[in-house]
Amino acid sequence: KANKYLHNILGLKYSYNKNDNKDNKKDPLAIFKKVKRQRYTIDKDVPVYDNSCMKEYTDLPYIDWVREGVMPFACKRFNIGYSYDRKRIVIPERKWDGDDNEYIGISGRTTVPNYEMFDIPKFFKLSKSYPKGINVYGLNENYQTIQEAGYTVVLEAQKSVLKRYSRKDGTAVAIGNCELTEEQVRILISLNVEIVVALDEGIDINHIRQECDKFYPIRKVSYIYDRWDLIKKGSKDSPADMPNKVYNFLLKHRVLYDESERRKLKDWQEKQVKN
């Protein structure tokens, strides 16, 4: 008020914005805030599809996927198809706790070369609904193996699960991106097994620790981190893209997320806030 009074006496224009005094410092946590956080609630009205949802697609594996290591028997188990009209690999996603004939949705992955140049989306929803955030891909098919092994490896992409299954490894699941939703965390906790977080190359180690922290200390949790540069830098490849020998090495030398790891995360967070 005093400032406003003095401005009036001197005939000066008075303006004040309460945000003017705030520092315009770069937010050190911006990299994490860029990830869109979504909260998912279980909707009893979410439709569940049966095998008829795949009738318009060809029941054949895509040859380039076979060359990459996704075997026909894996495609058959996960009911992978192909759409000639849309030029997309058809990927149905079974409900994690449903029957073999229950799907929550279908996505199509383009096979068009240089699709970015033509503004063609890499993935496209082929079903009316597809609430990925309330499901964990591959858990329906791999549940028994995961229980027997006592752990599950959480990957990003559906194809990564298919690659591991092609190598006779039924412990992998996929969450669809690099951040677990609250519902996916609840689903994985319910398995009562070790959770191994294995995100793609290039993901910051502190982001990985944040994902591990969602399970700690309720479940034993660990993470795969390539300290040996076995995965090409800048490739954004998944550990599942590596030869089986490399993948097993990374899995064997996974890092247990414990109090020491958690302290590193908290120290980093505090340091970023101070800066």
Locations of the language-model features?
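TOPRIM metal-binding catalytic domain and adjacent DNA-binding surface shared by DnaG-type primases
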Residues: 2-90, 94-95, 262, 266-275
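Short, flexible coil/linker elements and helix-boundary hinge sites characteristic
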Residues: 11, 79, 119, 150, ...
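Short, solvent-exposed polar/charged micro-motifs at secondary-structure junctions
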Residues: 29, 84-88, 115-117, 231-237
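Phosphate-handling DNA/RNA-contact segment within nucleic-acid enzymes
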Residues: 85-191
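Short flexible/disordered coil segments
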Residues: 1-10, 143-145, 150, 210-219
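TOPRIM fold recognition
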Residues: 163-275
